């Protein structure tokens, strides 16, 4: 993404575009091939809009969204190739599956759409995909309603893998599950990413999940990325006060819960002057309320949007 911004469609009578709302505001983000990236932030931070732009479901109103240095979905042929190469695992996995279709038919659908294998080889390919995600071959004859929450997530992953993608995008793919099922799915995603050489983009609000699964992390606040870098480095020694606040809010064994951030999240329709985190930042100084910090390099692998980055202790 190159300085991507996204405002509501002006043709929408309920749009807030007239008052300057930007769900994304000048976002710069590069995902390297074969790596895993976690996008983390509170509700309303812009994660969902970022996801839609990454998938080509929304076009940015400013800046560019590129895939292999070419604009996403430019032309019909490239759009079909992009849809095959970039697969999605939705947060509502059960809702993404047609309840009237068997699991086998659901997984076979992208095989046919993208002409992956001959029709006579579909059943064998479906069985391979089910095995890859840890489900028995006879699951192909069942319906989504007969599966548990964890099994449905595995089916959604198998269906995403059917098109033989290079990039797998997962939106809160383990949320709402018990801890043991979450752990099993995270281990599955980790092994798939490693064994298949996938590029993984994982949207989450859970820092523990991000730390376990992803090599790199991007932290969002009110439509902007405020810090990026290797996950261990960012979570081990955050440079942005918001990153530090998120880490402090995550439950830790044998440690008392930290005090929540003061104040309320500003309305995106009425952003504060200067740094948009200044109204809640415990480290804010006078210039933070005047200058709007941009994402800038902080060492060879990290970047932060802060006038006074935190220093490692």
Where are these regions (language model features)?
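Charged, flexible cofactor/metal-binding loops and thiol motifs
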Residues: 10-15, 20, 230-313
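ABC ATPase NBD coupling module
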Residues: 13-18, 72-87, 105, 113, ...
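Helix-to-loop junction immediately C-terminal to a conserved catalytic motif
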Residues: 55
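Conserved ABC ATPase "signature" region
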Residues: 121-138, 247
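Conserved ABC ATPase signature
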Residues: 143-147, 151
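A short, proline-enriched helix->beta-strand linker immediately N-terminal to the Walker B motif
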Residues: 162-166
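P-loop NTP-binding/switch modules centered on Walker-like glycine-rich loops
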Residues: 177-259
